[in-house]
Amino acid sequence: NNKRDKFGLIDKKGNWMLKAEYDAISPKDSFFVVSKGGMQSVLTENLKPILPFMEADLWISGNSITATMKDHTLRKYNLQGELIDDFLISNVDRLLYDTDEIRYTTAKNYDDEGNLTGETAEAEPTPYQKTANCKKYEAELGWYGLMSPSGKVITPPRYCDITAIGYDLYLCKTDDIRGEVLNGKGV
C-alpha cells in the first residue's frame, strides 16, 4: 500500500500470492504466521490456512503450533490444525509459606586436627517454612494460577505472582501493586 505498513507475498514473476493487507508475515519452516488487526493465522507454504485467524500469539516449534491466548492460557495444535491440548500448562511449582517458628543457623568450628572448637550462631533468624496445600502452575510465561494437590486447576492463569501466606491461604497478585487473597478453593 502507499503507507508501506502492510505486507504481502509475491512470486518470482511479481504476481501477488498474498495481498499486502497483513501487519506481519513470519516464515517458519514450511509455514507462515500472518498477523492482521491483532489476530494471527497459520498458512502452509501453498498459502492454505491451517488455523483460522484468532486473537492469539501463534508460534511453530517442532511438530506443533502453540497459541498464547489473550487470557494467558496456552493451546497446542498439530501441524494439521487439530487441537491437541486446549489448556497447556508449562510448569508446576510447590509453594512454601513461613511459619511462626524461627531458626538460627549455626556453623561448627574445627581446629587443624579436626577437633570441634566451638559453634557460632548467625545473628539473623531464618523463618521455618512448610509446604502449602496448593501448588501454582504457569501457562503463558509469567502468568500463574492455583492448582489443587491432586492437579485440578482452581483459578485461571490471571496472576503475575502467587505467594503462599499460610497452609491454605495465597496472595495472588494481578500486577506489581494489586492482588487478592484466596484460599485453596479459589475464594
Regions found by a protein language model. Name each.
Residues 1-187:
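Residue-level detector of conserved, function-critical positions
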